[in-house]
């Protein structure tokens, strides 16, 4: 045992109790809250500020790698325009004419005219913007006073200003020739005095001269001799002409020639249509549908029926079975009664004898084939009541044989059986057809064959 103790004492050692250290008391500050819970901090924890987020840095790097994406749409449009121009330059006259014929064959005339007007409008706007740029360049100081190192830029601006001067001079000269003689002639260069005389134009009216004075001014232009005729012809070829009729109320300029104004900004006179006018439908077509062809057969239902079309008139001495008209309850409507029934009863239609009220058996058989369920239901219900009265002997022996023959020739029984079949999905049509067949079977007396 002693040996074991010596071994453990060498390994573990002696257990010695040390004196305790001096304890430091920590005073806790007890905070009392009014509601029993600690107050919530209103400030968020501060985050480490970064100069740029990863997403922004990625997008910035992407924009640097692919510059010019903002004007991608304009570049695509310019590329398409250049490709079309190159293709047109490679085509000969026959190919161009063939392409034009193909376009005319595939596009309607009114749509093609609309596209042409849109193209002319865009072209005019583009030319107007170019002229404004040129006029702003003309109003710049004298380019000849620039230093020699800017000679190239000054020459380019000088050429553009010269071309603008020639264009305006050609327009003024053509207006002067048209107002004096009325015959076209090649434009000529104007002198400095003529240009100054055209700078200010006054329009004088005899009644209110002071109130209606209008001044037209042009920028001062120096006459430049050159290829005026070529530039004028080129501008006249590419710019659409505007017809400006001269004023007819005595409006004149300083030199006595009538001034011309563009009246396209004025609204067109509104034409009021009179329904009582005999040519009302022609005016209606010209105002709202000028590009559509006129088909008289399709327009006949708009016109009032003529007296000659009224074949179901009291003055008629005899009638056939297919001309006899019936009401919705299956009763016969006489010619005199058909003239007195008002239109709001629903018995007038655009069939034969539109002045007369009622439906014939032929018209009802036609409505039995209608794809509109309401029309089909009215026809089935009316035919069922007519056949019930017919088989009951209500129409007497004078009309009954002819009406029985007409019912069989019009295949009315077959049409009713088809409407009552399971293939018809409309339940109202099926139920009314079954009811009509039941009425036919209950009153089967004078028919040559069974109704069902």
UniProtKB/Swiss-Prot annotation:
Give the matching InterPro entries: RNA_pol_II_AP1_C, RNA_pol_II_AP1_N, RPAP1/Rba50
Ranges annotated as biased composition (Basic and acidic residues):
125-135, 156-165
Per the record, the GO terms for biological process are:
transcription by RNA polymerase II
Which keywords does UniProt give here?
A: Cytoplasm, Nucleus
Keyword Repressor appears in the UniProt entry: no
Compartmental location = Cytoplasm; Nucleus
* Region Disordered: start-end pairs: 60-83, 125-202, 223-261
Provide ranges: composition bias, Low complexity.
Answer: 170-191
Q: Where is the composition biased (Polar residues)?
A: 136-154
Q: Name one GO cellular component term.
A: cytosol
Q: Which domain of life is it from?
A: Eukaryota
Under Pfam families, the record lists: RPAP1_C (PF08620), RPAP1_N (PF08621)
Give the coiled coil ranges: none
UniProt subunit comment: Interacts with RNA polymerase II.
Described purpose of this protein according to its UniProt entry? Forms an interface between the RNA polymerase II enzyme and chaperone/scaffolding proteins, suggesting that it is required to connect RNA polymerase II to regulators of protein complex formation.
Q: Which family does it belong to?
A: Belongs to the RPAP1 family.
Protein name per the record: RNA polymerase II-associated protein rba50
**What species does this protein belong to?**
Schizosaccharomyces pombe (strain 972 / ATCC 24843) (Fission yeast)
